[in-house]
A protein has these predicted regions:
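Structured, hydrophobic secondary-structure cores that serve as assembly/anchoring elements
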Residues: 1-2, 60-86
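Alpha-helical scaffold segments that mediate packing/assembly in large oligomeric complexes
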Residues: 1-66, 197-202
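Sequence/fold signature of self-assembling virion shell proteins
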Residues: 44-53, 88-202
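Short, catalytically relevant binding-site loops at active-site mouths
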Residues: 28, 80-84, 117-121
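Residue-level signal for secondary-structure boundary elements
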Residues: 18, 22, 34, 68-71, ...
Length: 202
């Protein structure tokens, strides 16, 4: 069924926008004591430095110092950082991904997930780029995002779909489909958020 296939792809694209906006909202705006933005310290890989376990430990220390509750800590790794750990860390590779929960193995108190649309930061200022902004190759790199479930909230309203089939569309004789929803995902405080940004190569 071609119509059903198109609608399904539309729904997937719709969800992708929701998820990308949510992770952008949960990433800290800039580096502060309670919203640490760290840079990776690993070996150079192309135009950036790789993520290492030491970088995740540094983020844990920053959360501990900021007195962020240990329970409910989430770390969402971008695709580059997952690849870094898979290539460098045999233990991580052996425990990679739980097909039942969708989570990667737990690391240093963080429940770990993977998402390829994490935000970008300016590596000099450690400030987050606006949603949808095009990253500059000379200064901006992608991050992995950390947050505390105790410092975040989400609310999903109902989703309404609209469909007009070609047979009842005298203007263009095309099938028209659209969706509308109300959803929000935000930090409740400017704390308990963190990011590890790929550093520029030296």
């Amino acid at each position: 069924d071609k119509m059903a296939s198109v609608i399904e792809r539309h729904k997937e694209a719709f969800d992708e926008v929701r998820f990308s906006r949510a992770i952008h909202s949960l990433a800290p705006a800039e580096n502060t004591a309670k919203t640490p933005v760290l840079l990776t310290t690993g070996e150079v890989d192309g135009d950036r430095k790789r993520l290492t376990r030491h970088d995740i430990i540094a983020l844990k220390k920053a959360f501990d110092k900021a007195k962020i509750p240990a329970e409910g800590r989430i770390l969402v790794l971008c695709a580059d950082h997952v690849a870094d750990l898979l290539e460098q860390d045999q233990k991580f590779a052996a425990q990679y991904y739980n097909y039942d929960s969708g989570a990667i193995n737990r690391m240093y108190g963080f429940e770990v997930y993977e998402y390829d649309a994490c935000p970008y930061y300016n590596t000099s200022t450690k400030k987050k780029l606006a949603y949808g902004a095009v990253p500059a190759a000379a200064t901006d790199r992608q991050c992995s995002v950390a947050f505390s479930l105790k410092r975040a909230m989400k609310a999903n309203g109902s989703t309404k779909t609209y469909l007009q089939e070609a047979a009842s569309n005298p203007t263009t004789q095309e099938n028209l489909f659209s969706m509308r929803t109300y959803t929000i995902c935000l930090p409740t405080k400017s704390e308990g958020l963190g990011a590890i940004v790929s550093a520029l190569k030296a």
